[in-house]
A protein has these predicted regions:
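Ribonuclease/tRNase effector modules and their secretory precursors
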Residues: 1-88
Length: 88
């Protein structure tokens, strides 16, 4: 069983960038929450303090970029994209 960090259980906060990408990439908050619920792993992102979460959606691999906000105990979701798409 995968060990998740403490911030994994924090409430989600969505960035304005994510909200735009949800529309562009045709996925919903429910889709995103499902991706995170069934995520298979995580690794540090190139941006300090951020993490890349590996997930699946519509039978494709996706990456969800998150940033824990310890002071607020929130997990800020920065963006989400299919792994074969460029990150914008």
């Amino acid at each position: 069983m995968k060990q998740w960090p403490p911030w994994w259980a924090w409430e989600l906060e969505f960035s304005p960038h994510l909200l735009k990408r949800m529309e562009d990439r045709r996925f919903t908050e429910v889709d995103l929450r499902r991706m995170l619920e069934h995520a298979t792993g995580y690794r540090p992102d190139v941006a300090p303090g951020r993490w890349v979460v590996s997930a699946r959606h519509r039978r494709r691999g996706w990456e969800v970029i998150v940033e824990p906000l310890p002071a607020e105990k929130l997990l800020l979701v920065i963006t989400a994209y299919p792994v074969d798409a460029s990150r914008t």
